[in-house]
């Protein structure tokens, strides 16, 4: 009997020490009730609180990466090497099947026609595209066309800044799974499902809010830099 008490006491002390070393939170599992039978006891998950902040930061980093790429793509505006890809030629072929387009610096496009016999058809397709672009023959290569791009106007710059702002709002707060607001709300739902509502939970919630605020600031800073670039500042 003495040995049994000693064993129980030792086990209890070890369990208590483990809890002090690694703080945990409790999360309810849904109870199950069989037909005509008693309700089963609720099971409890032991959750390490740090996983919520880790999850938040990981998803925020991914969103920030996507946001940065979308801002960059949007900032290019009409300077897009794929601008002609879906144009149709007189013979019914698609532009991208007959030629390729690359950026040549910031002020022009370079079109390389695969078959020199199709150069006239390519020129006609570009002129008919309604984009107000005029291809010029490259003197040193009869299969290449240089297309000067018109300089952006004050109006076009302002419109592009509005588009950048739309991208910012999408990643700041929208139903998109990649928006910071959506990710934050999902993590908060998980925190609210915890059974243990004490100071440890409050601290985690405060940390989540701080991290969210920091990442919104990062979005805002990238937007300001993109707007300055567009406005030529």
Swiss-Prot record:
Record has Transit peptide as a keyword:
yes
Cross-referenced InterPro entries, in alphabetical order?
Answer: Ribosome_recyc_fac, Ribosome_recyc_fac_dom, RRF_sf
Protein location: Mitochondrion
Matching Gene3D superfamilies, A to Z? 3.30.1360.40, Ribosome-recycling factor
What Pfam families does this protein map onto?
RRF
Give the gene symbol. RRF1
Q: Name one GO molecular function term.
A: ribosomal large subunit binding
Identify this protein by name: Ribosome-recycling factor, mitochondrial
